[in-house]
């Protein structure tokens, strides 16, 4: 594949999952993508010459009445085969659509397609690790892609084509080291999905200021807003004040609050050492850091040394 390749983004609606078991196609949808644009769409109803399970009718909204006048697959297969030849096959779960379509071609005596193939499910899993669902309907919602008729092949194919373009842009926006790390693992992707990433990779560019590279990883630089607690108000001496400052994640512990108050009071009034015995789980780190944060200033710095 190269920059001039035509990508055939295909979706099939079928009576089931196995051509060998007698399942057949009821709708073929395809969106042809070239140079980053959808250049043609194809929608074809197909008479399966068998009953369509009620579950499939409910899922797709395609009734047997709509299929009665549709052509049989062997009537449209030569034209579909010609359209797909010399393209790169793309599907959302390519290991279903591509083998099923090839099995249908073989069934009527046409040669199997020998195409490179890309899986948009895997692309989404790699490029959108933060989302919880990789169903086409959820991904189109994530990218605000209009998807009028889920589980109808023409709508699914067009939506998958738009998803492919969104995922391409997502990959090309990644920092160069991240792109290169994914490309190095291209052999582990489904079919030629990894080769597609290699083909669309952006030219090397320096990291933006908000990123830092740590070994093979590129991380966003931590951004913090320093807070001068000494000028942020009075030390929270009461239980209510401590809860107001630290909630919602803070769980008030009476012994910890007592430790805070003792350290704050001691630091202001005496140079006599203060010894505190505190059990495991009391929250000693916050117990001494909070009062010291109210005592430290740019002019009067504090150093805390600890072995834990």
Q: Where are the regions that the model predicts?
A:
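Short, glycine/acidic-enriched loop or turn micro-motifs at the edges of active sites
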Residues: 14-16, 96, 122, 159, ...
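Post-Walker A helix-loop "phosphate-sensing" segment adjacent to the P-loop in P-loop NTPases
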Residues: 294-300
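Conserved Walker A/P-loop ATP-binding site and its immediately adjacent core
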Residues: 300-308
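Conserved pre-motif I regulatory segment
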Residues: 226-277
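Walker A/P-loop
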Residues: 268-291, 302
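Acidic, divalent-metal-coordinating active-site segment for phosphoryl/phosphodiester hydrolysis
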Residues: 152-167
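Conserved non-catalytic scaffold segment of RNase H-like nuclease domains
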Residues: 1-117, 129-151
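Acidic two-metal-ion nuclease catalytic site recognized across multiple nuclease folds
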Residues: 2, 166-238
């Amino acid at each position: 594949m190269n920059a001039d390749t035509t990508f055939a983004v295909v979706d099939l609606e079928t009576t089931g999952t196995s051509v060998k078991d007698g399942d057949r196609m009821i709708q073929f949808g395809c969106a042809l993508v070239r140079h980053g644009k959808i250049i043609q769409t194809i929608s074809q109803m197909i008479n399966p010459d068998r009953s369509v399970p009620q579950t499939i009718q409910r899922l797709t909204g395609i009734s047997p009445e709509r299929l009665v006048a549709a052509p049989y697959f062997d009537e449209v297969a030569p034209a579909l085969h010609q359209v797909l030849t010399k393209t790169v096959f793309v599907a959302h779960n390519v290991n279903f659509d591509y083998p099923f379509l090839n099995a249908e071609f073989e069934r009527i005596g046409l040669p199997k397609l020998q195409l490179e193939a890309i899986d948009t499910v895997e692309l989404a899993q790699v490029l959108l690790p933060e989302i919880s669902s990789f169903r086409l309907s959820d991904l189109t919602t994530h990218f605000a892609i209009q998807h009028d008729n889920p589980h109808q092949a023409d709508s699914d194919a067009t939506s998958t084509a738009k998803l492919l373009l969104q995922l391409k842009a997502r990959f090309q926006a990644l920092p160069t080291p991240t792109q290169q790390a994914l490309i190095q693992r291209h052999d582990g992707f489904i079919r030629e999905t990894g080769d597609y990433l290699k083909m669309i990779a952006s030219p090397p560019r320096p990291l933006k200021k908000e990123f830092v590279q740590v070994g093979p990883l590129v991380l966003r630089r931590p951004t913090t807003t320093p807070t001068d607690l000494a000028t942020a108000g009075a030390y929270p001496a009461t239980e209510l004040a401590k809860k107001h400052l630290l909630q919602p994640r803070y769980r008030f512990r009476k012994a910890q609050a007592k430790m805070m108050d003792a350290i704050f009071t001691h630091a202001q009034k005496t140079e006599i050492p203060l010894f505190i015995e505190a059990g495991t789980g009391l929250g000693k780190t916050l117990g001494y850091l909070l009062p010291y944060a109210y005592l430290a200033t740019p002019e009067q710095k504090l150093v805390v040394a600890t072995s834990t």
